Regions:
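PEST-like, low-complexity acidic/proline-rich intrinsically disordered segments
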Residues: 1-16
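Extracellular or lumenal secretory-pathway regions
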Residues: 21-355, 362-552
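Intracellular C-terminal tails of type I single-pass membrane proteins
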Residues: 550, 554-560
Length: 560
């Protein structure tokens, strides 16, 4: 009985254990086990991925930091640093500028010049014309009125690049009136010389008898006066006379224009085809110098066999040559003056923290040349300080000078009174950055005068004005600074870039030397370690061999 009870209990416990096993095998417990398995697999996979990523990083790091790569980088950095010391980034920029590639900043700035040039015009009012014609005053007296301010707009178009490393384009200049900057009433009247009549008489003073007879008839018919009253606007833009208009209708070949307005004549034909030098083959000194003007190398209107002056080597004033020195002479071409104007180094100065050079127009620019090659003289000869400009104005008797006859060989009261020459107000100069040839400020001041020849063959009132030079007006072309983007670019290129390039080049050199030195030191250290290991192993091998021989010897002796 006791055995049966025990057997029953054992069966119960067995069944209980079986039930508990059944409960463990239910679906919930199975899913838990599967999730735990998934989690374990995920963790293992993540750990494996991390390990693989670390391995790849270590491999890349090992590749990047390998001795061969370090050696290549070291040599490359040293070569780059030496090259940057020899050929600096500034040299590269100046060389690239020579090509004038469309889309690059130098070309874009030139193709659309900034509106920075102001034209200030001053006219002369005659105050004693009646007394002068009556013989009460020996000389005319003039007073200056102005300025009348315009913006001179410059347009570049029709650009084409030639095979001989030159660039041809069309340059057009025209003025735009600026009412906000003007205090002069253009409707105000002034007394001025009758430029059309006096100019035609002076132009034809050596004409034949028939031509002079026609002119006398016109004078008798219209009875013009040597001095007239006109508005300032008409004097500048619409100045004519019935005698001039009739003369042009009768003999248009002798009288090419009927409107003698001062600015009207200056800007009547100011669309010019220019050809300039570009490209590395010309070098920095000849960059953007004029090679042809309207297809010709000489100044327009002059005979190349008589006048040795050539227009090539000059500049229109927008861009100058690069790498200028204090010994360089800048040739400035302005059709208004009809001659090349030389500028010489004057002083060093700083504007906007940029070191600059100032070049002044020679005070002898209008003097006579004594070697027989004076292209700007007339017959009879002009006074020093005057330059013939008639070749650019249909042979009309016009001469150029400094404003108020400043400097030159003309005393200020030689022809008229009332002039007040002042070096500060009447000289011309350009201030530019010498490496890039960028003009920061430029002022060109010129005076136009009427040259009156001997008029004794006409009425007495005209004869009184004979053999004189009458100031008509003078103009100032002033480039007032630069746009901020150009100024900042020049500042960075000249002031910031050179020391910055030295720092970068020096840093590259030091890093290259460091990499090579480190590599050499590491190789020497590895060689020493290898030698030590080989020596240690060889010593161990010898000791082991000695021990083996000793053991074999001892065994042999015992056996014996």
């Amino acid at each position: 009985m006791s055995s049966e009870k025990i057997l029953h209990e054992d069966n119960g416990s067995s069944s209980g254990s079986l039930r508990s096993d059944d409960s463990d095998s239910n679906p919930d417990s199975a899913s838990d086990s599967l999730n735990s398995l998934y989690k374990t697999n995920d963790n293992t996979c993540a750990e494996n991925c991390i390990e693989e990523t670390k391995c790849e990083v270590n491999k890349k790091r090992g590749t990047c930091c390998s001795p061969v790569v370090q050696c290549v980088w070291g040599v490359l950095l040293i070569l780059l640093s030496i090259g940057s010391f020899i050929f600096t980034p500034l040299d590269f920029m100046l060389l690239e500028k020579l090509n004038m590639r469309p889309g690059m900043p130098p070309y874009e700035w030139w193709s659309d010049p900034p509106d920075e040039v102001k034209l200030r015009t001053y006219v002369f009012n005659v105050t004693n014309h009646e007394r002068f014609l009556l013989g009460l005053d020996q000389k005319l007296n003039v007073e200056e009125i102005g300025p009348i301010v315009y913006l001179e707009k410059l347009l570049h178009s029709n650009v084409r690049f030639n095979e001989n490393s030159t660039m041809t384009y069309t340059a057009k200049r025209f003025p735009i009136y600026l009412p906000d900057l003007n205090n002069i009433d253009l409707n105000a009247t002034i007394i001025v010389p009758n430029v059309g009549v006096l100019g035609i008489f002076s132009y034809l003073h050596n004409a034949n008898y028939f031509v002079k007879t026609v002119l006398r008839s016109l004078v008798s018919m219209y009875n013009p006066e040597p001095f007239v009253q006109v508005s300032i606007y008409d004097y500048l833009w619409n100045f004519t006379d019935p005698v001039l208009e009739m003369s042009r209708s009768l003999v248009p070949g002798l009288v090419p224009v009927s409107n003698t307005g001062m600015l009207a004549r200056v800007y009547a034909d100011f669309t010019d085809e220019m050809t300039v030098k570009i490209g590395p083959q010309w070098g920095h000194k000849e960059f953007f110098q004029i090679d042809r003007f309207r297809g010709q190398p000489q100044i327009p209107g002059f005979d190349p066999d008589v006048c040795p002056d050539r227009i090539f080597g000059s500049t229109e004033g927008v861009m100058y040559a690069q790498r200028l020195t204090k010994q360089d002479v800048l040739q400035y071409w302005r059709k208004t003056v009809c001659k090349l104007m030389p500028l010489y180094f004057d002083s060093e100065l700083t504007m906007f923290n940029v070191p600059l050079y100032r070049y002044n127009l020679s005070e002898n620019a209008f003097d006579r040349v004594t070697n027989g090659t004076d292209c700007y003289d007339t017959v009879p000869s002009l006074h020093p300080g005057l330059s013939d400009t008639s070749k650019c104005y249909f042979d009309f008797p016009m001469v150029a000078s400094f404003p108020h006859f400043y400097t030159g060989g003309i005393p200020k009261d030689k022809f008229v009174t009332g002039l007040k020459p002042d070096r500060y107000k009447h000289n011309s100069f350009v201030i530019l950055e010498p490496y890039t040839g960028t003009p920061f400020e430029a002022v060109a001041r010129m005076q136009s005068n009427l040259l009156v020849h001997d008029l004794t063959g006409f009425q007495e009132k005209f004869a009184n004005v004979s053999n004189s030079v009458i100031p008509l007006f003078w103009a100032e072309y002033h480039q007032e600074g630069l746009p901020s983007k150009i100024r900042k670019t020049v500042y960075f290129s000249i002031v910031i870039l050179p020391p910055l390039s030295i720092i970068i080049s020096t840093t590259m050199l030091l890093i290259g030397i460091y990499l090579l030195t480190k590599l050499i030191y590491s190789n020497n250290l590895e060689n020493d370690s290898l030698k030590s290991i080989l020596i240690f192993k060889s010593k161990n091998n010898i000791a082991n061999k000695n021990k083996m021989l000793a053991f074999e010897k001892e065994t042999f002796l015992k056996t014996s």
